[in-house]
């Protein structure tokens, strides 16, 4: 893993306890990678040679000088963490003071911008592994910690100087040379360190008690390094992973760590952001902050804070100005950060709960309002097939005007539907009545036709009966025999026999009285000849006679009368009681004489109603037949 910016890391870990993981895994990048700015590290290399000489005397201690310039006073305080004896540490401090004074003087005169590599925090403590050959030190480091395919992807981005730790109002830039132990050398020099004794702490840069590097140094941030100094750090603390880290699984990709961490933490950018710089000096220390674009290895822990919707007003920079550095201050700072983070998390949870509660309350109110609605009416809607369906309507009670409008529309629809149904029923009723009237009219016309037919038949029957009655009367009067008191020889008996012979069986009813004169003999050939002559002169009569002779039944007068009375004919039947056939027999002495018969036939009483009751008889009556005596 390559160098990570100290600013982003220290923004996460404000105390020194949380930043001790740089001891074994994080190293500065090589200056040879930046050919354009190769002179930046010249002073650093000179200091490195002096440190190597000093390390031979102090059992391999390594120093990293962090120089801050001042126009008025250049107080170079060398803070040594541990040494074998006080003489060696004091001598090394004196040597470093002399060298640092020269370097600071050159930097102030020439306005050089690269006095040291500042990662936005003066407390960024960089540990360098020591080797006997100082020239090969950086090559070995980068061969171990950098991958060859990622070396060409390193970038150096320059930002304005952000010196968060120059808090001296006295215009004094105290250049504190913070000397920290390497992990391997700290194990060798544990018995030489003063327990719990901090050194010169003008800018809150201090050494602290180191009892056990596996317990004390790494206990605060949960980082457990390997025993070998040249291997990477393995993070084993699971709760810290859950709270502050995400693991990138089995992938390598490049992320500018400084930019990504600042955007995730809502930390303001470092451009022109001098948060705690209260110096009134005129020194333009344009120290370039070099941000490295580094590859993220698989299973690497990326610091990600808890999500927050509010502006995190937590100052993650070191704002300790002119304060006495004590171990308790570090604990207080860490406690403050943890409490602030907890407060933010609580606020977020409260807001989420409020939002969820408000949403749930609204849903419950809507559900209650829906449950309170009742189906107060049903709206008839005309379907596609011509039928109507009833759709239930709900009363929400939200808007009175809208509700009134809906009621009015429902009422109009009901009225229209009722009117339509009434018109349909009325039309069906009228059509039924019209059909009945048409049927009755047809039957009435049929009955009228039948009545006319019956009237015409009745008229024809009357004409035939009246016409035949005259002929029969005349024939009987001519053939009435003389004397003969027997019943068989009487005219009535003969007429009955003749009629019975002519009429079909079942119609042999006795003839009415008064049709034939008494004593008329129908067996007389003269009577038969008279009937035949009359029939020859009248075609209708001839047809009737032929029908009778051939066996065709001729209706009797009674049947014709009953048929006329059954048909309710308006024309009343003839009155058979008229004495039209009553012949006045003046000659009672000679009733059988032919002359008297002729006279009797001709002398018809004038009171007879023949001419009145039968006005439609034909005028061309058959002529009277002559008697044999007249021949």
From Swiss-Prot:
List the SMART domains hit by this protein, alphabetically. Answer: BRLZ
Segments for region (Disordered): 46-117, 154-207, 264-406, 546-631
**UniProt keyword Cell cycle present:** no
Q: Which residues form a coiled coil?
A: 35-62, 328-366
| UniProt KW Lyase keyword | no
Top-rank taxon, per record: Eukaryota
Chief place where the protein resides:
nucleus
InterPro entries registered for this protein in UniProt: bZIP (IPR004827), bZIP_sf (IPR046347)
Q: Where in the cell is it found?
A: Nucleus
Q: Please give the SUPFAM superfamilies that the UniProt record associates with this protein.
A: Leucine zipper domain
The record's GO CC annotations read: nucleus
Chain positions covered by the region annotation Basic motif:
407-427
Where's the bZIP domain?
A: 405-468
Task: Give positions of region: Leucine-zipper.
Answer: 433-440
PROSITE patterns (UniProt xref): BZIP (PS50217)
Which keywords does UniProt give here? Coiled coil, DNA-binding, Nucleus, Transcription, Transcription regulation
Q: Where do transmembrane segments lie in this chain?
A: none
Q: Where is the composition biased (Low complexity)?
A: 155-206, 271-360, 563-609, 618-631
| Gene Ontology MF: a single term | cAMP response element binding
Q: Which GO terms describe its biological process?
A: culmination involved in sorocarp development; positive regulation of gene expression; protein kinase A signaling; regulation of sorocarp development; sorocarp morphogenesis
Family from the record:
Belongs to the bZIP family.
Q: What does this protein do?
A: Probable transcriptional regulator.
Q: What is this protein called?
A: Probable basic-leucine zipper transcription factor F
| Annotated source species | Dictyostelium discoideum
Q: Report which gene this protein is encoded by.
A: bzpF
């Amino acid at each position: 893993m390559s160098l990570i910016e100290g600013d982003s890391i220290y923004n996460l870990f404000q105390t020194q306890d949380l930043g001790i993981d740089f001891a074994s895994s994080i190293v500065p990048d090589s200056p040879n990678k930046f050919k354009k700015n190769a002179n930046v590290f010249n002073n650093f290399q000179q200091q490195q040679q002096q440190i190597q000489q000093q390390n031979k005397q102090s059992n391999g201690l390594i120093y990293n000088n962090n120089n801050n310039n001042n126009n008025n006073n250049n107080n170079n305080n060398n803070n040594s963490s541990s040494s074998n004896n006080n003489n060696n540490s004091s001598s090394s401090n004196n040597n470093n003071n002399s060298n640092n004074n020269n370097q600071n003087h050159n930097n102030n005169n020439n306005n050089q911008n690269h006095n040291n590599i500042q990662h936005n925090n003066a407390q960024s403590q960089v540990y360098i592994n020591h080797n006997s050959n100082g020239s090969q030190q950086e090559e070995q480091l980068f061969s171990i910690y950098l991958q060859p395919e990622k070396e060409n992807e390193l970038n150096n981005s320059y930002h304005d100087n952000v010196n968060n730790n120059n808090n001296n109002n006295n215009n004094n830039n105290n250049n504190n040379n913070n000397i920290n132990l390497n992990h391997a050398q700290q194990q060798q020099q544990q018995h030489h360190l003063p327990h719990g004794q901090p050194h010169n702490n003008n800018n809150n840069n201090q050494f602290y008690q180191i009892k056990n590097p596996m317990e004390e140094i790494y206990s605060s941030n949960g980082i457990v390094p390997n025993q070998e100094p040249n291997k990477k750090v393995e993070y084993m603390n699971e709760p810290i992973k859950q709270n502050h880290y995400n693991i990138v699984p089995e992938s390598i990709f490049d992320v500018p760590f400084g930019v990504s961490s600042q955007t995730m933490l809502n930390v303001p950018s470092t451009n022109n952001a001098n948060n705690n710089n209260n110096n009134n000096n005129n020194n333009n220390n344009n120290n370039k902050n070099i941000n490295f674009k580094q590859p993220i290895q698989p299973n690497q822990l990326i610091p990600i804070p808890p999500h927050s919707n509010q502006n995190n007003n937590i100052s993650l920079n070191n704002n300790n100005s002119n304060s006495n550095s004590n171990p308790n201050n570090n604990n207080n700072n860490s406690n403050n950060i943890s409490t602030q983070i907890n407060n933010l998390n609580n606020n977020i949870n409260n807001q989420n709960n409020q939002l969820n509660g408000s949403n749930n309350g609204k849903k419950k109110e809507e559900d209650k309002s829906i449950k309170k609605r009742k189906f107060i009416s049903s709206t008839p809607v005309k379907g596609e097939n011509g039928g109507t369906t009833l759709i239930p309507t709900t009363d929400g009670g939200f808007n009175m005007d809208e509700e009134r409008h809906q009621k009015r529309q429902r009422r109009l629809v009901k009225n229209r539907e009722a009117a339509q149904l009434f018109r349909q029923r009325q039309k069906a009723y009228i059509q039924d009545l019209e059909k009945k009237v048409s049927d009755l009219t047809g039957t009435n016309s049929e009955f009228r036709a039948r009545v006319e037919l019956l009237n015409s038949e009745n008229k024809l029957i009357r004409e035939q009966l009246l016409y035949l009655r005259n002929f029969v009367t005349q024939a009987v009067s001519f053939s009435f025999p003389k004397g003969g008191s027997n019943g068989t020889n009487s005219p009535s008996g003969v007429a009955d026999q003749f009629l019975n012979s002519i009429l079909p069986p079942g119609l042999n009813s006795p003839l009415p009285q008064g049709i034939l004169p008494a004593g008329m003999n129908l067996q007389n050939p003269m009577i038969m000849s008279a009937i035949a002559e009359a029939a020859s002169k009248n075609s209708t009569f001839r047809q009737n006679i032929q029908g009778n002779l051939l066996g065709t039944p001729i209706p009797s007068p009674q049947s014709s009368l009953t048929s006329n009375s059954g048909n309710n004919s308006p024309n009343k039947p003839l009155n058979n009681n008229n004495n039209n056939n009553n012949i006045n027999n003046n000659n009672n002495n000679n009733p059988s004489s032919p002359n008297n018969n002729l006279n009797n036939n001709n002398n018809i009483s004038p009171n007879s109603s023949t001419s009145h009751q039968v006005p439609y008889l034909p005028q061309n009556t058959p002529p009277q037949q002559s008697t044999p005596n007249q021949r």
